[in-house]
């Protein structure tokens, strides 16, 4: 990166170099098997959660893989790819003065192209500080053979 001094003695970045990349942010992920969490339980922190770092340029499938890596793939009983993750964002709406939940999509771990796996996080409207609620279900279509 070429840094040149200007007359004000503050460094200027050269226009020929692009930025290194977007900044990651911490995402609080609240999870439960088979059912959705209640919105108020998420804001009261009574539900188990994990923390993952994410980027706005990542897809829902990539977020699902990060979540599965911490929750599912470390346990011998749940170490298979036949899982579907229903992802929604939880945020506090200051105009309505209450928490709001909005579905982002469903991700299948065995195929990133199914459902909304290719959707970018920045296209979903998620912002820093929003919480993620994940419902983890076995993919019944793939398990029945």
Curated annotation (Swiss-Prot):
Keyword annotations: Cytoplasm, Nucleus
Gene3D superfamilies to which the protein is assigned, alphabetical: ASAP complex, SAP18 subunit
One Pfam match: SAP18
Keyword Cytoplasm listed: yes
Main location (coarse class): cytoplasm
Keyword Cytoplasm appears in the UniProt entry: yes
Annotated localization: Cytoplasm; Nucleus
Record family assignment: Belongs to the SAP18 family.
InterPro entries from the UniProt entry: SAP18, SAP18_sf
Single biological process term from Gene Ontology: mRNA cis splicing, via spliceosome
GO cellular component, one term: ASAP complex
Protein name (Swiss-Prot/TrEMBL): Uncharacterized protein C126.13c
Coiled coil feature spans: none
